């Protein structure tokens, strides 16, 4: 390699290392910045548990569309009633 190419490669590598070392690191609380001590760590975990609990709560939505009764369902009910009348037994 020519000395200019080696110098350029070294400069690019140095720039890449400096950029990587000086970049923002994430704290244990999954939020940027802040100190990493044990007290904040416990608070962060408790905060995460609260957030997950809020996400886990389900919301109930009612169906707004009208679903007509199926004719087959009505026919099945009529046949069951007819069979019960003929046999004299009641469905359990």
UniProtKB/Swiss-Prot annotation:
<dbReference type="GO" id="GO:1990637">
    <property type="term" value="P:response to prolactin"/>
</dbReference>
<dbReference type="GO" id="GO:0048545">
    <property type="term" value="P:response to steroid hormone"/>
</dbReference>
<dbReference type="GO" id="GO:0043204">
    <property type="term" value="C:perikaryon"/>
</dbReference>
<dbReference type="GO" id="GO:0031530">
    <property type="term" value="F:gonadotropin-releasing hormone receptor binding"/>
</dbReference>
<dbReference type="GO" id="GO:0010468">
    <property type="term" value="P:regulation of gene expression"/>
</dbReference>
<dbReference type="GO" id="GO:0007267">
    <property type="term" value="P:cell-cell signaling"/>
</dbReference>
<keyword id="KW-0873">Pyrrolidone carboxylic acid</keyword>
<dbReference type="GO" id="GO:0032496">
    <property type="term" value="P:response to lipopolysaccharide"/>
</dbReference>
<keyword id="KW-0732">Signal</keyword>
<dbReference type="GO" id="GO:0005615">
    <property type="term" value="C:extracellular space"/>
</dbReference>
<keyword id="KW-0225">Disease variant</keyword>
<dbReference type="InterPro" id="IPR002012">
    <property type="entry name" value="GnRH"/>
</dbReference>
<dbReference type="GO" id="GO:0044849">
    <property type="term" value="P:estrous cycle"/>
</dbReference>
<feature type="site" description="Cleavage; by ACE">
    <location>
        <begin position="26"/>
        <end position="27"/>
    </location>
</feature>
<dbReference type="GO" id="GO:2001223">
    <property type="term" value="P:negative regulation of neuron migration"/>
</dbReference>
<dbReference type="GO" id="GO:2000354">
    <property type="term" value="P:regulation of ovarian follicle development"/>
</dbReference>
<feature type="site" description="Cleavage; by ACE">
    <location>
        <begin position="30"/>
        <end position="31"/>
    </location>
</feature>
<keyword id="KW-0956">Kallmann syndrome</keyword>
<dbReference type="GO" id="GO:0030425">
    <property type="term" value="C:dendrite"/>
</dbReference>
<feature type="site" description="Cleavage; by ACE">
    <location>
        <begin position="33"/>
        <end position="34"/>
    </location>
</feature>
<keyword id="KW-0964">Secreted</keyword>
<feature type="modified residue" description="Glycine amide">
    <location>
        <position position="33"/>
    </location>
</feature>
<comment type="similarity">
    <text>Belongs to the GnRH family.</text>
</comment>
<feature type="signal peptide">
    <location>
        <begin position="1"/>
        <end position="23"/>
    </location>
</feature>
<keyword id="KW-0582">Pharmaceutical</keyword>
<dbReference type="GO" id="GO:0005179">
    <property type="term" value="F:hormone activity"/>
</dbReference>
<dbReference type="GO" id="GO:0098556">
    <property type="term" value="C:cytoplasmic side of rough endoplasmic reticulum membrane"/>
</dbReference>
<dbReference type="GO" id="GO:0035864">
    <property type="term" value="P:response to potassium ion"/>
</dbReference>
<dbReference type="GO" id="GO:0045471">
    <property type="term" value="P:response to ethanol"/>
</dbReference>
<dbReference type="GO" id="GO:0007165">
    <property type="term" value="P:signal transduction"/>
</dbReference>
<dbReference type="InterPro" id="IPR004079">
    <property type="entry name" value="Gonadoliberin_I_precursor"/>
</dbReference>
<feature type="site" description="Cleavage; by ACE">
    <location>
        <begin position="28"/>
        <end position="29"/>
    </location>
</feature>
<dbReference type="GO" id="GO:0030238">
    <property type="term" value="P:male sex determination"/>
</dbReference>
<dbReference type="GO" id="GO:0034695">
    <property type="term" value="P:response to prostaglandin E"/>
</dbReference>
<dbReference type="GO" id="GO:1990008">
    <property type="term" value="C:neurosecretory vesicle"/>
</dbReference>
<comment type="function">
    <text>Stimulates the secretion of gonadotropins; it stimulates the secretion of both luteinizing and follicle-stimulating hormones.</text>
</comment>
<dbReference type="GO" id="GO:0005183">
    <property type="term" value="F:gonadotropin hormone-releasing hormone activity"/>
</dbReference>
<dbReference type="GO" id="GO:0033574">
    <property type="term" value="P:response to testosterone"/>
</dbReference>
<keyword id="KW-1016">Hypogonadotropic hypogonadism</keyword>
<keyword id="KW-0165">Cleavage on pair of basic residues</keyword>
<dbReference type="GO" id="GO:0033087">
    <property type="term" value="P:negative regulation of immature T cell proliferation"/>
</dbReference>
<keyword id="KW-0027">Amidation</keyword>
């Amino acid at each position: 390699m020519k000395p200019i190419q080696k110098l350029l490669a070294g400069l690019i590598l140095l720039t890449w290392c400096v950029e990587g070392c000086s970049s923002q690191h994430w704290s244990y609380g999954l939020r940027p910045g802040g100190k990493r001590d044990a007290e904040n760590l416990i608070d962060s975990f408790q905060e995460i548990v609260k957030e997950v609990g809020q996400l886990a709560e389900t919301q109930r939505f009612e169906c707004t569309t009208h679903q007509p009764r199926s004719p087959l369902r009505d026919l099945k009910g009529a046949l069951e009633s007819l069979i019960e009348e003929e046999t004299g037994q009641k469905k359990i």
